Amino acid sequence: MNSPTTATAATSAPVTAVDPKSFTRFAEFYPYYLGEHRNPACRRLHFVGSTLALVCLGMLVATGRPYWLLVGLLCGYGFAWLGHFGFEKNKPASFKRPLYSFMGDWVMYKDIWTGKIPF
């Protein structure tokens, strides 16, 4: 009789639960962050949300109207959370490590632009 571990190992790699709070350095956290963004649709939604957030930041600077900050945050987080809940089927790491997740989003954004991570 197969144990749950054996059955899981036979069909796919076992999933190990990692608490994002356990990381003490961003360099340790980033590989975990990328693992939470395996689905291309999730990455694309992050990319679109980050791009729109940058546009909103530009509008904030150009117009001086503070509501662009709110719109930028809604775009950035809204698209990312849609990717996680709709496609990746996981909870965003920003719920447990908000600063590292924010940093990870911008590093991933750069990595997509430079071709290090597929769009």
What are these regions (language model features)?
Residues 69-74:
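Hydrophobic alpha-helical transmembrane segments
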Residues 57-60, 83, 112:
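Structural signal for membrane-spanning alpha-helices in multi-pass inner-membrane proteins
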Residues 60-68:
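Transmembrane helix interruption/hinge and helix-loop junction motifs
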Residues 45-58:
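Core segments of transmembrane alpha-helices
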Residues 75-88:
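Transmembrane alpha-helical segments that form the membrane-embedded catalytic/substrate-channel core
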Residues 13-33, 89-119:
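Membrane-proximal soluble regions of multi-pass membrane proteins
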Residues 35-46:
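Short, amphipathic, aromatic/basic-enriched membrane-interface segments that mark the entry/exit
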Residues 1-18:
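Short, non-transmembrane cytosolic segments of multipass membrane proteins
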